[in-house]
C-alpha cells in the first residue's frame, strides 16, 4: 500500500522549485485571484521552518512589514506558487527559528553563508 501512495505522490511533486534551507531569505511569487483578474504578488522573507516531506511539505516565511512581523505558511507543491527565488543563503544551527519572533532590529537577522 505504501508503495502505491509513494508512486502517486512522486508524480505530483513539483520539480521546478529550487531547494532551499531554513535561514535562507527567499522570494515567493504567489498567484492571487482578485475578482476575475489574476496577478502575481511577491512575499520576501526568511524561512523559519519546513515541515513534513513529500507531497504534504510546507514552509513558513517570516518578514517584518512596517514594524509588524508577518508569517505566511505555504504548501510546497501548491499551484498558487508561481516561482521561488533564493535571495541569500543563511547560516543557522537550528531546524526551527522560532526565536526570531522575539527579536527586533539587527538581532533578528540571520548570518549570511559565504560561499567560495
Swiss-Prot record:
Record GO biological process:
translation
For this UniProt record, the keywords arranged alphabetically read as follows: Ribonucleoprotein, Ribosomal protein
The record's section on InterPro entries has:
Ribosomal_bL19, Ribosomal_bL19_CS, Ribosomal_bL19_sf, Translation_prot_SH3-like_sf
**Which GO molecular function terms does the record list?**
structural constituent of ribosome
Pfam families assigned: Ribosomal_L19
Give the record's GO CC terms.
cytosolic large ribosomal subunit
**What family is this?**
Belongs to the bacterial ribosomal protein bL19 family.
Spell out the PANTHER family in the cross-references: LARGE RIBOSOMAL SUBUNIT PROTEIN BL19M, RIBOSOMAL PROTEIN L19
Instruction: Sum up the protein's function in the record's words.
Output: This protein is located at the 30S-50S ribosomal subunit interface and may play a role in the structure and function of the aminoacyl-tRNA binding site.
Q: What is this protein called?
A: Large ribosomal subunit protein bL19
Native organism:
Clostridium beijerinckii (strain ATCC 51743 / NCIMB 8052)
Amino acid at each position: 500500500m505504501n508503495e502505491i501512495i509513494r508512486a502517486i505522490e512522486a508524480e505530483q511533486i513539483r520539480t521546478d522549485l529550487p531547494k532551499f534551507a531554513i535561514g535562507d531569505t527567499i522570494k515567493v511569487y504567489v498567484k492571487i485571484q482578485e475578482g476575475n483578474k489574476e496577478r502575481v504578488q511577491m512575499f520576501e522573507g526568511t524561512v523559519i521552518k519546513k515541515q513534513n516531506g513529500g507531497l504534504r511539505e510546507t514552509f513558513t516565511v517570516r518578514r517584518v512589514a512596517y514594524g509588524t512581523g508577518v508569517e505566511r505558511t505555504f504548501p510546497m507543491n501548491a499551484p498558487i506558487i508561481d516561482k521561488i527565488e533564493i535571495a541569500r543563503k543563511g547560516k543557522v544551527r537550528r531546524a526551527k527559528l522560532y526565536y526570531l519572533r522575539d527579536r527586533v532590529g539587527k538581532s533578528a537577522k540571520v548570518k549570511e553563508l559565504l560561499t567560495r
